[in-house]
UniProtKB/Swiss-Prot annotation:
It catalyses: Co(I)-[methylamine-specific corrinoid protein] + methylamine + H(+) = methyl-Co(III)-[methylamine-specific corrinoid protein] + NH4(+). GO terms for biological process: methanogenesis; methylation. Keywords: Methanogenesis, Methyltransferase, Pyrrolysine, Transferase. Its EC number is 2.1.1.248. Catalyzes the transfer of the methyl group from monomethylamine to the corrinoid cofactor of MtmC. It comes from the Archaea. This is Monomethylamine methyltransferase MtmB2. One of its GO terms (molecular function) is monomethylamine methyltransferase activity. Pathway: One-carbon metabolism; methanogenesis from methylamine. It holds the Pfam family MtmB.
Length: 458
């Protein structure tokens, strides 16, 4: 039976009030892992150690498994403890009517985001920034300016303000609202100081409540041509605060960036199972949120990193599959184990940039160095590496890319437990001139040389 109308966030809210009852433990510990395991077996999924897939038939099976995961499981609402189900026609309606391209930013700083494919010769868009990492109030502008000064960077992804007017931005407090507005206002000033006043940003990152996120759309703050973030919950879950934010974004005609980081080794399970959930999550972004693009980020449950062998494989297969069988636009976010000013951090980011570029990602978003959890440990140099490596990777043969990745990951994967902490922005840069130290430049050159030895041509 055909659907009455295209599905939207208001339909989601209504169904979240009347859907099938389920405890969160049953959802997390039974429904998600059992269905993912069942679908892996049903479709015979085996990625055979490839980072970026070369088997189109296996990719098609993965797409079918991800579609079926979303159709049969639905989405769990954590507020009502009910399951929201879509019909098959509603899902296809969303897939068939996605935004095929959009513009971020204004004036000469605007960039056009268009679909890429596996092995595409065009470099993806580089969204450089702290990626939700905590940043001190006193260096908030120079940290973001360090990204805007890099020509490899096309747009900015915001950091989190640890304080505003010296006070913590407690959720649902006046300070959260102020921080949500101030976050983007300061970043746009930083971009203007770098000579790029029309650069788009992606956020807000500081606020955790619906009122905080909605308040970020303001004079001098988030504009409709910026990427507006809303986050799904692990795995295939959402709360009603997020649905309210989605309603605002759609009513405001904002570019919507639907974000979620599937956890390898978590509720979904292993590599293939987590990738099935990742594909389902991609599709849900466009059904539930009416997203302009989906920001991915498979993360390792033990290491908290997106750059491990397992998470790179999940990211590569999920993106290549989405790229091959839909027009949905996808990005990926970067969380290395090592901190800034270290060779390991740059190599980790490079491995993910190679994977994302080769598998058809439209947007690379990072780098949240030191796992994105240490204050002020992120700089524009990591984003430069992400961009330069993407440029070197674009158009390369996938079989060669997989060989390079195997060797590259082997250089750092034994060091996760003892990853170098690195240095803060203040130690990596001259804060007044917003330029990297000679020491960091030498480390950067050393990492670049290693990548050249592995086969990348800059």
């Amino acid at each position: 039976m055909t659907f009455k109308k295209s599905f939207d966030c208001y339909d989601f809210y209504d169904r979240a009030k009347v859907g099938e009852k389920c405890t969160q433990d049953d959802w997390d510990l039974m429904k998600i892992p059992m269905k993912a395991m069942e679908l892996k077996q049903k479709y015979g999924l085996d990625f055979k150690g490839e980072f970026v897939p070369t088997d189109r038939d296996m990719m098609e099976k993965l797409f079918q498994a991800g579609f079926e995961m979303l159709l049969e499981c639905g989405i769990y609402c954590t507020d009502t403890h009910r399951i929201v189900k879509y019909t098959e026609d509603e899902i296809w309606d969303a897939i068939n009517n996605v935004q095929k391209e959009f513009t971020l930013g204004t004036g000469r700083d605007a960039v056009n985001v268009r679909k890429r494919s596996v092995g595409d010769k065009r470099k993806p868009i580089v969204q450089g920034g702290p990626t939700g990492s905590p940043i001190s109030e006193d260096v908030f502008m120079p940290v973001h300016m360090s990204y805007a000064l890099e020509k490899e960077v096309d747009t900015i992804v915001n950091g989190v303000m640890t304080s505003v007017r010296g006070k913590p931005p407690v959720p649902k407090s006046p300070y959260e609202v102020l921080a949500a507005k101030t976050e983007t206002r300061l970043i746009k000033q930083a971009c203007a100081m770098a000579g790029r006043p029309g650069m788009a940003v992606o956020g807000p990152e500081t606020s955790l409540s619906a009122q905080g996120n909605i308040s970020a759309d303001c004079a001098g703050g988030m504009q409709s041509t910026d990427s507006h973030e809303v986050s799904q919950l692990n795995e295939l879950k959402i709360d009603l605060d997020a649905i309210a934010v989605i309603a605002h974004y759609n009513a405001n005609s904002d570019i919507i960036m639907d974000e979620q980081m599937p956890i390898f080794g978590g509720y979904a399970g292993g590599i293939e199972e987590t990738t099935i959930v990742d594909v389902a999550t991609h599709i849900n972004a466009f059904v539930m949120s009416n997203a302009s693009w989906h920001l991915d980020g498979p993360v390792h449950i033990r290491w908290g990193s997106t750059n491990t062998r397992e998470t790179l494989t999940i990211a590569g297969w999920a993106c290549a599959t989405i790229s091959e069988f839909t027009d949905m636009l996808s990005g990926n976010q970067y969380y290395p184990c090592a901190g800034p000013g270290t060779e390991m951090c740059l190599l980790e980011a490079s491995a993910q940039s190679i994977t994302d570029t080769a598998s058809g990602r439209e947007i690379l978003s990072g780098v949240a160095s030191a796992k994105g959890v240490v204050t002020d440990k992120t700089t524009g140099m990591e984003a430069r590496m992400m961009g330069e490596v993407a440029r070197a990777t674009a158009g390369a043969e996938i079989t060669e890319i997989n060989k390079i990745l195997d060797k590259l990951v082997a250089l750092y994967e034994k060091n996760y437990a003892s990853a170098p902490a690195g240095k803060t922005f203040q130690e990596c840069y001259d804060v007044k001139t917003v330029t990297p130290t000679e020491e960091y430049m030498q480390i950067y050159d050393g990492a670049r040389k290693k990548l050249e030895e592995l086969g990348l041509v800059f």
